[in-house]
Swiss-Prot record:
It comes from Staphylococcus epidermidis (strain ATCC 35984 / DSM 28319 / BCRC 17069 / CCUG 31568 / BM 3577 / RP62A). An aminoacyl-tRNA editing enzyme that deacylates mischarged D-aminoacyl-tRNAs. Also deacylates mischarged glycyl-tRNA(Ala), protecting cells against glycine mischarging by AlaRS. Acts via tRNA-based rather than protein-based catalysis; rejects L-amino acids rather than detecting D-amino acids in the active site. By recycling D-aminoacyl-tRNA to D-amino acids and free tRNA molecules, this enzyme counteracts the toxicity associated with the formation of D-aminoacyl-tRNA entities in vivo and helps enforce protein L-homochirality. This is D-aminoacyl-tRNA deacylase. Belongs to the DTD family. Keywords: Cytoplasm, Hydrolase, RNA-binding, tRNA-binding. The lineage of its organism: Bacteria, Bacillati, Bacillota, Bacilli, Bacillales.
Amino acid sequence: MKIIVQRVKNARVTNDTIDNQINKGYCLLVGVGQNSTEEDVKVIARKIAHARLFEDENDKLNLNIQQVEGEILSVSQFTIYADVKKGNRPGFSNSKAPEQAKDLYQKFNKELEGYGLIVKTGEFGTHMNVEINNDGPVTLIYESQDGKII
């Protein structure tokens, strides 16, 4: 699994059927790879839930999302696993098949909720408009494989 974590002042995802937004927190762009497993879901959700990406009174990144009462906007994004080595058009064979990816994506969001986090989502497998108001910017890439952070 690969997840781009962006610390945001606010973020919003919309399409014809949804309109979800958050204030302070993380916007997560979630990629589910061919070899992603439920163990990857658990380890990466735990890592993100406990990540200290917010400044304390000394401007050090010492506070996690719970401590600042932040929220999460989780958006599925299979293009994170694009292969751009050959030609000019990306290939997506490294992404998990849609039904399996959707299942792991939903489990990932539930796992985050299990840490007491408020998680709002986009709509899996559809075209969406995503508005991200980065804070910092603070942007990190988390990746798990074989149940371990890599």
